[in-house]
């Protein structure tokens, strides 16, 4: 185990000397596909946008509960962790600003100034994200209420908050102590800080040779992924506990699963563990890549069960669970014509490319990466009906506040 669960309850969760370089390497290249091309995250995050809107009431309830117990400061600071490079992060922030402003107004107080931090790994395409930001609301442009009434998300004419980017991993400290009122992280915590060490070790019982994901893997591989998720989430919680203001709140949503078996990753398994896996096997059989090259690639994603998530939060002890649910979401495939197999195939390939394309290209190069996604598109088109009918995600949705 690369990061000991035994230290989860302590002040710090330690990282082994061997693990640190691997974490740094992954952090230097892991990101959603930047830019605005066909395979970019910007143009393939519609599913995340739909899922976020379905969870809107959970976020609003989190903010309402926070405002009941917090003081009315002149500055309100929010941080979105794992912001990526699409407009979904801006939508979340607009909801926060709107809801908090309404709470101040209901108390007969002027709305505070808002400071928002957008945080992701240094490899993230912050330029694309910040190009989506509307200009800052000028004093002569109208009231906060007028600005908020102008629209939501990237369509807002101006923004009523100061914005800044914070590059770094959320599995460590990012902000000064007691400086953040509300944290949000949507669709990011299922990304691990690293592929578990033993999964790539051919001498280990947990070696995942022949496979590129934990779905349908051996019990030992699944256990290694589970331990990595537990250790990562513990480190995340300890860092946020130091950075959150007393009375603050944290809203989290990540991929989850309904099965008690870690090797049954549900919708994530269909995304990465079936046709994506088969596309890798195609390249090996065709001699495009060597088997060892496939065997050394693993997707660093883990969809936890509700109980696994709850166990880590309780073991850490820094946070009280205000709400924790497993919510059935929709499909990651957003298509206009679900009966069009070619369109479904393209959507599947682009969805995988948007979230894993950078890792694939770093491992086998852009040319062979393009060949991989071509194989994936063809396979997905042949199984379009099954994908449309069966592919849906579950999400762990959680609201936390600092424990008394």
Curated annotation (Swiss-Prot):
How would you summarize the oligomeric state and partners of this protein?
Homodimer.
InterPro entries of this UniProt entry? MeTrfase_7, MeTrfase_capping, SAM-dependent_MTases_sf
Question: What cystine pairs are annotated?
Answer: none
Quote the protein name from its UniProt record: Indole-3-acetate O-methyltransferase 1
Pfam families membership? Methyltransf_7 (PF03492)
Catalytically driven reaction(s): (indol-3-yl)acetate + S-adenosyl-L-methionine = methyl (indol-3-yl)acetate + S-adenosyl-L-homocysteine
Q: Which GO terms describe its molecular function?
A: indole acetic acid carboxyl methyltransferase activity; indole-3-acetate carboxyl methyltransferase activity; metal ion binding; S-adenosylmethionine-dependent methyltransferase activity
Q: Which SUPFAM superfamilies match?
A: S-adenosyl-L-methionine-dependent methyltransferases
Belongs to which family? Belongs to the methyltransferase superfamily. SABATH family.
Domain of life where this protein originates: Eukaryota
Q: Where does S-adenosyl-L-methionine bind?
A: 82-83, 88, 120, 169-171, 186-188
- Endoplasmic reticulum found in the keyword field: no
Gene that encodes it: IAMT1
pH-activity profile = Optimum pH is 7.5.
List this protein's GO terms for biological process: intracellular auxin homeostasis; methylation
The record's top EC class is transferase
The EC number(s) this enzyme carries: 2.1.1.278
Q: How is the cofactor bound?
A: Binds 1 Mg(2+) ion per subunit.
What keywords does the record list, in alphabetical order?
Magnesium, Metal-binding, Methyltransferase, S-adenosyl-L-methionine, Transferase
């Amino acid at each position: 185990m690369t990061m000991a669960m035994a230290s989860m309850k302590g002040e710090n969760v330690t990282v082994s000397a061997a693990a640190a370089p691997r974490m740094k390497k992954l952090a230097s290249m892991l990101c959603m596909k930047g830019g605005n091309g066909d395979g970019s995250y910007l143009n393939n995050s519609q599913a995340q946008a739909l899922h976020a809107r379905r969870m809107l009431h959970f976020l609003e309830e989190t903010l309402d509960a926070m405002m009941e117990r917090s003081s009315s400061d002149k500055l309100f600071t929010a941080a979105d962790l794992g912001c990526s490079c699409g407009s979904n992060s801006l939508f979340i922030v607009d909801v926060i600003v709107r809801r908090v402003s309404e709470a101040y107004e209901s108390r007969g107080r002027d709305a505070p100034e808002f400071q928002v931090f957008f945080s992701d790994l240094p490899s993230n395409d912050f330029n694309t994200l910040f190009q989506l930001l509307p200009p800052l609301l000028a004093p002569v442009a109208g009231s906060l209420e007028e600005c908020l009434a102008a629209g939501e998300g990237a369509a807002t004419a101006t923004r009523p908050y100061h914005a800044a980017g914070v590059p770094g991993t959320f599995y460590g400290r990012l902000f000064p102590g007691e400086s953040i009122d509300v944290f949000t992280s949507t669709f990011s915590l299922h990304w691990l800080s690293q592929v578990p060490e033993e999964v790539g070790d051919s001498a280990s019982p947990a070696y995942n040779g022949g496979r590129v994901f934990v779905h349908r893997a051996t019990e030992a591989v699944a256990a290694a992924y589970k331990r990595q998720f537990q250790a990562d989430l513990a480190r995340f919680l300890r860092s946020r506990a130091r950075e959150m203001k007393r009375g603050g709140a944290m809203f989290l949503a990540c991929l989850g699963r309904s099965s008690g078996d870690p090797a049954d990753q549900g919708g994530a398994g269909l995304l990465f563990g079936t046709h994506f896996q088969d596309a890798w096997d195609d390249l090996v059989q065709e001699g495009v890549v060597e088997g060892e090259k496939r065997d050394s690639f693993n997707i660093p994603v883990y969809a936890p069960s509700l109980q696994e998530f709850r166990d880590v939060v309780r073991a850490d002890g820094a946070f009280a669970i205000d709400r924790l649910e497993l919510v059935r979401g929709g499909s990651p495939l957003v298509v206009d014509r679900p009966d069009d197999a070619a369109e479904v195939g393209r959507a599947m390939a682009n969805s995988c490319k948007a979230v894993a394309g950078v890792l694939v290209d770093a491992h086998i190069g852009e040319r062979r990466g393009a060949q991989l996604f071509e194989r994936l598109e063809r396979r997905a088109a042949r199984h379009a009906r099954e994908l449309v009918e069966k592919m849906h995600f579950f999400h762990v949705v959680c609201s936390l506040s600092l424990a008394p």
